[in-house]
Amino acid sequence: MTLQPPIPVLRIFDRALAKAFYVDWLGFRVDWEHRFEPGAPAYLQVARGPVVLHLSEHYGDCSPGAKVFVHTDDVEALHRELSSRPNRNMRPGVDIAPWNAKVLEVTDPFGNRLLFNQPLPAA
């Protein structure tokens, strides 16, 4: 048996706001979207490289305010990329975490947080 990486489900309230944040700003792509019928809440999968997230407008799927920890090998490159795309609500910086890593944290319009983490060499 082989376990695969988990796929976090994040609560969203507006598909257009979610797309603006995850696709237009963070650089994810929409892999697919599902609605049980026209006008029903959306459930979609977004991905960037190996990172896959599910975004749900469905009440009861999950609660807003989740935090997802994403490993990366170059937080500074991500910071430059995000800084090149205007976002009036987010201007994240790069910090050094107590666990000896460079981190960049962003918060989506629904209160969910993504923490991008780059471990630093041991001192």
Predicted regions span which residues?
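N-terminal beta-strand motif that seeds the catalytic metal site of vicinal oxygen chelate
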Residues: 1-19, 66-68, 119-123
